Amino acid sequence: MLHSLNLKLEQGKIYGLIGRNGAGKTTLLSLLSAQNPKTQGEILLDGQNVWENQEALKHIYFSREINPNSTVYSGLKVKELLKIAAAYLPDWDKEMANSLIQFFHLDVKKRISKLSKGMTSMITIILALASKAEFTFLDEPVAGLDVVAREQFYRVLLEEFTESGRTFVVSTHIIEEAADLFEEVIFLHEGEVLLKENTQELLEQCRYVSGKTEDVEQAVQGKETHGKQILGRSQGVMVRLKKGEELEHTEQVTLQPMSLQKIFVSLCSGEDETI
């Protein structure tokens, strides 16, 4: 369930939607693409409500997990699913779809019910990219893919973004691997948006400060901190600096840059953690 969510997506960016299982990532993408009905609030595309608005929905595509055991895909072959997509999606790029089929070495004569998890993920990727939708949402697109296939996906996504300037929202739990793709990240936790921030700026704002407890507390006094870890007489904590802010009294502490994953974990931490 989502709570009091206010979110604006700008055109021409790749967003990373990051959250734990059950945080609401799939629910959010379903709402944005009008696949789930909202209970309150508005979802607008260029000022137009997207719900039951076919003109607006032409510009949105949500690529979600394919369940090969679903009756929807019972007996369906890959090539038949792609034919349905071509008929349904107004901007379908058949040439791109065929190119990606060869790129991923997919057998289009196979029945979807016989495909592995990785292969069904490849199909969701092909549907998303070949849809050519202005706003394209991908829900855990690399699930089941090995490291080589994941790198291939990141490359073709970046190539398509560079050529088209489309807006992509990619939900993932493999944060570090995809971090370089994201111009902005959206952290979702327990149905709420923790932050929506430029990725590079967020990395520059955050530092991990560690040392003796009294030295760390002096260094971060008055600053925004998260994820405190206490080990005996020592502690470590993430500090997030506002624009123009600097840390003082850092002579006796250790400062380290933080990865996107560690920033996310720190922001989602609740009470102080004693190790």
Task: Show the residue positions of the predicted features.
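ABC-family P-loop ATPase nucleotide-binding domains
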Residues: 55-58, 64-123
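Helix-to-loop junction immediately C-terminal to a conserved catalytic motif
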Residues: 33
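Conserved ABC transporter NBD signature motif
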Residues: 41-52
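C-terminal coupling/interaction segments
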Residues: 227-275
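Catalytic Walker B motif of ABC-type/P-loop ATPase nucleotide-binding domains
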Residues: 136-140, 145
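The feature captures the beta-strand-to-loop junction immediately N-terminal to the Walker
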Residues: 15-20
